[in-house]
Design a protein with these regions (language model features):
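DUTPase catalytic domain/fold
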Residues: 1-129
Length: 129
């Protein structure tokens, strides 16, 4: 685990790249705060059948993403509905040569019942926002 000072050094020498990083992102002792973007997608299936994941993926690949609803988060914020899955991305783009970044939600979010799931980070044309 790197300290915030070491993260800053690695950014300065180019080993870690963080595009659009906020000025105060490294204020904690051993982390870099990331922000969610202003667009999210709501997964509109009431029940997600894990045996059917290939069909969900096929819909995305065939541009038939009827189960995803695009929502722009207004300046005033957005009230999240319970029992929904929301997909979004960070404002920042993080790349690194030699480190494996770990992303966790803040304790405050966990206390509210919100969990953060990190995916592989591969870019897809379906979610360019």
């Amino acid at each position: 685990m790197l300290t915030s000072n070491e993260i800053r050094k690695q950014i300065d020498n180019g080993t870690i790249q963080i595009e659009n990083m906020a000025e105060d992102a490294l204020k904690k002792p051993n982390s870099c705060d990331l922000r969610i973007g202003n667009v999210l997608y709501v997964f509109d299936y009431e029940i997600v059948d894990t045996k059917n994941c290939k069909n969900y993926l096929q819909e995305v690949l065939n541009d038939q993403i009827s189960h995803l609803r695009r929502v722009v988060i207004p300046e005033t914020g957005l009230l999240l509905e319970p029992h929904k899955v929301y997909l979004t991305k960070t404002v920042e783009k993080v790349t690194t040569n030699g480190y494996v970044p770990v992303m966790n939600g803040k304790t405050m979010l966990s206390l509210l019942g919100v969990s953060v799931e990190l995916t592989n980070g591969y870019k897809t044309d379906h979610f360019d926002d």
